[in-house]
């Protein structure tokens, strides 16, 4: 019986864990990353080092793999969408488009009737100052921030006046809340609409 070939975009820590779990299931892993220092390189069966829009690599990757997934959310949507037009990408690229952007993500969660902290989209310093009622708050870049990067704690209007905002970025201002507990919930839906 032929082994399943799993294509994984991104080579970080989650890619390592995915490769280790796949080995236990006798799944062959092909990791594609644009980072030569990717830790998953050491755990994958095959490693492709290239930027994600390399046509030659796209052709090779999609011919070699049976399924495609990604191990972090910052794979460009257009790349995932292109790959998905050739070979199925799971989760669907549209889901990743939402989680790549904190504003879209918060809107989506609220549309599901799940309450979040109060938040506002911020385009410039005037927006920031006019939403002082949310202070103290966290100002975050709408995209590409993770593990504390692109995040700024604002305690008062003076902090808002002193912060420098990039004209090339959208931001989200999130009201601080007193946490009693933080939990993470992962839900898996299989193709036959079974949930775990």
Where are these regions (language model features)?
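Active-site nucleotide/adenylate-binding loops and adjacent lid/helix of ATP-dependent enzymes
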Residues: 98-196
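ATP-binding N-terminal substructure of ATP-dependent carboxylate-amine bond-forming enzymes
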Residues: 1-104
